[in-house]
Amino acid sequence: MSDASSTAPSQAGATSQSTGSRTLLDKIWDQHLVHAPESGPAIIYIDLHLVHEVTSPQAFEGLRINNRPVRRPERTIATPDHNVPTSDRSLPIADPISRKQIETLRENCKEFGVQLFDIDDVRQGIVHVIGPENGYTQPGMTIVCGDSHTATHGAFGSLAFGIGTSEVEHVLATQTLLQFKPKTFELRVDGELARGVTAKDMILYLIGQIGTAGGTGYVLEFTGDAVRNLTMEERMTVCNMSIEAGARAGMIAPDQTTFDYLRGRPECPADFDAAVEAWKKLPSDPGATYDRSNLYKGSDIRPQVTWGTNPGQVCSVDSVVPSPGDSTDVNVQKSTASALQYMDLKAGTPITEIEINRVFIGSCTNARIEDLRAAAAVIKGHHCSDKVNAMIVPGSGKVKLQAEEEGLHKVFTDAGFDWREAGCSMCLAMNPDKLAPGERCASTSNRNFEGRQGKGGRTHLVSPAMAAAAAIKGHFVDIRDWDYR
C-alpha cells in the first residue's frame, strides 16, 4: 500500500468543481466524488476498508454467492479484535460463535486475497489502533469499517465513518459507497487544558455540552489551540467518540504533528515529502463556512466522569450526581431518573464517593502507548485496592511490545493490575472479559450503555489516569490532586 495516493483524486475519477473557500470535508468529498446526481445519494470512492470478524462474514458470503471478487484487496486490511481472548492464547477459543467468526475471517481473507493480521501476528490488534500505527491511515483519505468508532481515523484529517454489513459488501465489491454529504459542525476549543485534564475529558465534556444527538447529520471538525496542542494519539481519542455525539464522523485537520507521527511508518507513501505537500492543502480555508459552530474554553474543562447510561450523562469529578429535578425538561427528568436507578446512584452523592470494584484500561479510545504511560505514571509506587479487580489491555501487539520494552507492564503487575493481550476486551460483552451483574467499572472505553460491558454491569467512562487512580483508591478521585511518586 505504500505507493498508493492517499488523496486519491485520480482514483475517485472526479476532481473538484467547487469554487471559493472550502472546509476540510469539502475538499475530501470533492476529491472522492465519483458521481453526484441532482437528487439522491452521491457515489464516493473509498481509499481504505478496515475489516474485522463480526461484521464481515455475511458480506464475504454475499460476494461468494454472486461470484464477485474483492474489487481492491490491496486497499483492504483485516484483523480479529472484538471476539479475541486477551488471556492465554495458547488455549482454543472457548466460545463456539467467537471461534467460528475468527476462523471464518481467516478463510475469507485467504479466499479473497485480503491482508490479515491474525492473532499470532504482532500487528494484530484493535482495528482502529493498527490502522494508524502502521501508517495505513493517512490525511485526505476516505476510510470505512463495519464498526461505529471508525471516526477515530478522522484525527489524521480523513473522512472516516462506520458502515453496516450490506455496505461492507458494497465496498468490498466496488470500492465505492452511496452517501449523502453531511453538514459541517465546528467545535472550537481555545486556550489550554489544565494540568490533569486530558483529551478524554475534552471529548466527554463536549458531548455533555451538545448532547448525544447534538451532532446528528454532521461531521464534527475539532479546531482551536487546545485541539492543536494535542498529540496524535490524543486526537484519536477525541475523534473516536464523535459518534457518541450522534455525528457521522469527526475530523482534525492535518498539521506538522500529523506528519511527524506518520513519517517512517511502513505503509506511508514512498515519496513522503511529496505526500506532505499535498496534505498541507487539506485544512479548511480561511473564511470557510461551517453549517454550525460552537466555541469553548479549554480552561473550563475539568476531569470528567459519566454517571449515567449514555456518554452525555457526564459531569466533572469535583461535582455531585445530578437530580432529575435539575432540569425543567420532562424527557431529561425521565432519562435521569432511569439512569440513576440502573446505576444504583443517589442524586447529590459526590462523584468522589462513588466506589468501584472493576477497572478497565483499554479499547480503541484509550489503549495506545501514551494512554498506558499515563496510567503507569499514576500507578507507580502505589498498589491496586484489595476491593478492585483491574485489567490493562493494550490496543495492539505492537503497543504491548513497546510497553514491555519500556517496563510499563512491570509497573502494572507489581501494583496488582492484570496485564493482557491485545483486543477489544471489556469495551463490549462479546468476549470473556465481562462485568458481572451489579459490578461497577471505571472504564476508559467509549460507551456506558446498559449492559454494554456485561448484563447488569455499571460503567463509568473516564480517562486512563482517572481509571488508574480509582483502581488504587477504590473510588473516584480528582486526578489533579494525585500523589505522583
From Swiss-Prot:
Description of how the protein assembles with itself and partners: Heterodimer of LeuC and LeuD.
UniProt pathway: Amino-acid biosynthesis; L-leucine biosynthesis; L-leucine from 3-methyl-2-oxobutanoate: step 2/4
Region called Disordered, residue ranges: 1-20, 73-92
Could you identify this protein by its name?
3-isopropylmalate dehydratase large subunit
Kindly list the cofactors needed: [4Fe-4S] cluster
Q: Where are the transmembrane segments?
A: none
Q: Which InterPro entries match?
A: 3-IsopropMal_deHydase_lsu, Acnase/IPM_dHydase_lsu_aba_1/3, Acoase/IPM_deHydtase_lsu_aba, Aconitase_4Fe-4S_BS, Aconitase_4Fe-4S_dom, IPM_dehydratase_rel_enz, IPMI_cat
The gene designation is leuC
Entry's EC annotation: 4.2.1.33
> Keywords assigned by UniProt?
4Fe-4S, Amino-acid biosynthesis, Branched-chain amino acid biosynthesis, Iron, Iron-sulfur, Leucine biosynthesis, Lyase, Metal-binding
Key word Cell membrane present in the record?
A: no
Give GO MF terms, alphabetically. 3-isopropylmalate dehydratase activity; 4 iron, 4 sulfur cluster binding; metal ion binding
**GO BP terms:** L-leucine biosynthetic process
User: What is the native source organism of this protein?
Assistant: Rhodopirellula baltica (strain DSM 10527 / NCIMB 13988 / SH1)
PANTHER family, A to Z:
3-ISOPROPYLMALATE DEHYDRATASE, HOMOACONITASE, MITOCHONDRIAL-RELATED
HAMAP family according to UniProt: LeuC_type1
Co-factor binding details = Binds 1 [4Fe-4S] cluster per subunit.
Sequence positions that bind [4Fe-4S] cluster: 364, 424, 427
Which reactions are catalysed by this chain? (2R,3S)-3-isopropylmalate = (2S)-2-isopropylmalate
* Top-level enzyme category: lyase
Q: Which residues form a coiled coil?
A: none
